Amino acid sequence: FKEWKNAFKRFINNIPFYGAAIICIDDPTIQSIISEIEDKKIITYGLSPQADFRATNIVFKDSKTFFSLEISPKKDASAKKIENMVSNIPGIHNVQNILSVCSMAVELGIDLEIIKLALLGFEGVNRRFSLIKNYKGIQIFDDYGHHPIEIKATLSASREITNDKVVAIVQPHRYTRLKLLFEDFTSAF
C-alpha cells in the first residue's frame, strides 16, 4: 500500500507547472496524500465539505440525478452554487465522475451554464447502466461492469433509484478474473 501511495505522489509531482491535479477527496488515503504534496495545483472534488467542487442536495428520481454544484472560493474567485444540475445517469459514483468533469471544465474556463446544459444533454455511455426497456414499471438496464467494484456501484445506483426489488443477472466475463476475484464477486451482491 505504501508503494501505491508513493506512486500516486510521483504521478502528481510529474504534472508540469502549468497543469493541475484533479483529485477526489472523498477517500481518507487521498486526503493524507494531498497534504504531502507541495508546489502543485490541486483541485479537489467529491461529497466531502472540504472539496473544491462538491455536490449537495442529491436526489435520485426516475433514473435521473438532481443536485446542486457548490464551488468553494479560491484566492481569485468567490464561492458559487449552481442549483438544479440534472444528470441522465444515476448513482453516487456517477455524481463523483460528473464533479471531476465539472472541475476540469471550470479549470479550462468553460462557462458554468454551458457545463450545466452539456450535462443535461449527456445520455451516458452505451452499456453502462443503459435503460433498455421500461415494461409496466419494471426497468431493465444493461451494464458492462465486469469487476466486483463496478458491479457494486451499479447495484448501488439501482437501489438509489427504486424502493422495489433489484434483480441482477451476471455473465462472468473471464475465467481467470472470476477465479482470482471469486470472493469479491460473491460479496458484490
Cite the ranges covered by each PLM segment.
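Acidic, Mg2+-coordinating active-site environments of NTP-dependent enzymes
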Residues: 1-140, 163-164
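Short, glycine/charged-enriched secondary-structure capping and boundary segments
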Residues: 1-2, 35-39, 154-156, 181-185
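A conditional alpha-helix N-cap/helix-loop micro-motif detector
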Residues: 1-5, 148, 178
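Short, function-defining helix-loop hinge/capping sites that tune catalysis or transport
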Residues: 32, 105, 150-151, 179
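Short, glycine-/Ser/Thr-/acidic-enriched flexible segments
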Residues: 92, 109, 146, 173-174
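Conserved cofactor-binding/catalytic machinery of classical short-chain dehydrogenase/reductase
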Residues: 100, 146, 150
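Active-site beta-alpha connecting loops in nucleotide-dependent enzymes
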Residues: 125, 149, 155-189
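Switch II (G3) loop of P-loop NTPases
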Residues: 140-146
